[in-house]
Amino acid sequence: MKYTRFKSGSNINWGEIIGDEVIELSDNYINPDSSKTNTSHSLSDVELISPVTPGKVVAIGLNYKSHLGGKPAPEVPEPFYKLPDTIIGPGENIVIPKEAIAEKVKMQPEAELCLVIGKGGKRISQSDALSHLSLIHI
């Protein structure tokens, strides 16, 4: 199944992409099978947008072997934060700040895996962790 957030006119909705159509979902996108509406849009008539409205973006560092420089991977993940506007939608331009260009900062294009937590918790067991996710996005 392929889910998306999309803009149709001034409305923002969740939808399921089926072929060349987007079927609108109700607000409960976590369980799409029970939340499809009877409204559909041609994929060419909507704008696909960022999969989330980010508030807090927590990232994990040193998760690429090439970034470790021969050192062993850390035993405990090393989180850091990114600005909310670092998440963009399909086809949006990646804007490199002019200061980074002027200072010849090396940019590192990377594919990212986004895990959207839908259910809170504390001290969650590894075997139960996936049940707390509402969306996995690449």
Task: Annotate each PLM feature.
Residues 2-136:
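Active-site microenvironments in enzyme catalytic cores
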